[in-house]
């Protein structure tokens, strides 16, 4: 089993798809990596030689920011926006949608479950 950037790649899948299991590498980046190294994208992960796996590992380590390093960078960027106090930072801080979506309805994923409305106990008073 090939292990690249701390991720075990699936054995029976094509290497082009297998590389997308690494956080930060999608289909286009995967294709670019394989094209640069001259590896056939249709090759199964199991069929790669140890040398090819090492080449992929070296290229990803040198050129791309993946996994923990990328997650850290993303969280630091969000933290920076929150510290600046800009509009996007405030939206992150309040847990609301950041990219201009409506919030009157929808946005339930970002806002969380609905809070129950408080009901009055007595109802209408009689004289």
From Swiss-Prot:
Compositional bias ranges of the Basic residues kind: 108-127
UniProt superkingdom: Bacteria
Disordered: region residues: 95-127
GO biological process: translation
UniProt KW keywords: Ribonucleoprotein, Ribosomal protein, RNA-binding, rRNA-binding, tRNA-binding
Cellular-component GO terms for this entry: cytosol; small ribosomal subunit
Keyword check for Plastid: no
Pfam families: Ribosomal_S13
Gene Ontology terms for molecular function: rRNA binding; structural constituent of ribosome; tRNA binding
Known role: Located at the top of the head of the 30S subunit, it contacts several helices of the 16S rRNA. In the 70S ribosome it contacts the 23S rRNA (bridge B1a) and protein L5 of the 50S subunit (bridge B1b), connecting the 2 subunits; these bridges are implicated in subunit movement. Contacts the tRNAs in the A and P-sites.
HAMAP family documented for this protein: Ribosomal_uS13 (MF_01315)
Family: Belongs to the universal ribosomal protein uS13 family.
Protein name: Small ribosomal subunit protein uS13
Naturally occurring in which organism (per UniProt): Desulfatibacillum aliphaticivorans
